[in-house]
Amino acid sequence: FAMLYFSDHGVSVSDSANPVHHDGHVQGGYSVPLIITASDISSHQSVSRKISARHFAGIFQWLTGIRTENIPPFNPLTDEDNEPVMVFNGEKNVPADSLKPQPLILPDRR
């Protein structure tokens, strides 16, 4: 068996009435884990670099062995992508690194 998991969007945190939400204007809104497991995987490997969700079809091909001539397989453990990760911020595609980081929310100490 093989299983691939990733969320459709990240979450942001604020001190608003809706404290956990999607925010297309901060990096946390697009930061999601990618988890791959399979019956023939015998070790844990962690990758800390950003991988665009646009590689999903290639990752799926790499994992399953299914091939098409239109999309090359993409191994997220070894294949590098020199293009910046682009995200849609609700208005246009922008580089993910151009978004502001998630602000630190400190607890109210009243």
Labelled PLM ranges:
Residues 1-110:
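Catalytic domains that recognize anionic headgroups
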